């Protein structure tokens, strides 16, 4: 299984003062291969440590921590080495599997927890790294009407420290968005 990380190598520039996006120029391509059945189906990437660290979220329910090596000039990726494979727990304290493993997006909260949005069994859970202790952000039934393969698709940290989650398909032309400011429920 392999995943292309060409997206991580793109440079985005805006034309000075015009507000018009310039053409994207690829800086290079790297084909990432890793052993194991859990690798692949990557839904989200988070690059940190000044470009030397990576968290990758798989829709198969695994989170990969990796180290990125680059060419001497600091640009082109030369190697990505998985240093840890983590398996989140579901609401019952069991490793995610089947219907409960469809992870779509992640965001690091101001509390340092990694928050993961799941699509099929729609939920958002915070996890302590590296032990993956689960901290549900809502009750078991909160998002039951969204269960299936059209649940959460995007998750981000807001400037005020809260989280925003967006549903995959529009409802009446608008994308349902949920906001969380801590606690045990989400506002729509």
Describe each PLM feature range.
Residues 6-15:
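Bacterial N-terminal signal peptides
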Residues 19-188:
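Sequence/structural signature of beta-propeller domains
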Residues 1-4:
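Positively charged n-region of N-terminal signal peptides that target proteins for export
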């Amino acid at each position: 299984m392999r995943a292309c990380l060409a997206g991580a190598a793109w440079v985005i520039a805006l034309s000075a003062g015009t507000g018009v996006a310039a053409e994207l120029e690829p800086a290079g391509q790297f084909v990432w291969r890793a052993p194991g059945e859990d690798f692949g189906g990557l839904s989200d990437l988070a690059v940190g440590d000044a470009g030397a660290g990576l968290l990758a979220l798989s829709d198969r329910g695994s989170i990969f921590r990796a180290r990125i090596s680059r060419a001497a000039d600091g640009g082109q990726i030369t190697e990505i080495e998985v240093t840890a494979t983590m398996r989140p727990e579901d609401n019952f304290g069991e490793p995610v599997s089947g219907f409960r493993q469809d992870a779509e997006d992640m965001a690091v909260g101001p509390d340092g927890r990694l928050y993961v949005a799941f699509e099929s069994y729609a939920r958002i859970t915070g996890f302590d790294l590296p032990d993956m202790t689960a901290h549900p952000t809502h009750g078991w039934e909160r998002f039951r009407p969204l269960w299936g393969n059209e649940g959460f698709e995007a998750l981000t940290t807001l400037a005020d420290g809260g989280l925003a989650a967006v549903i995959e398909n529009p409802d009446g032309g608008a994308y349902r968005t949920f906001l969380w400011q801590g606690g045990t429920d989400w506002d729509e």
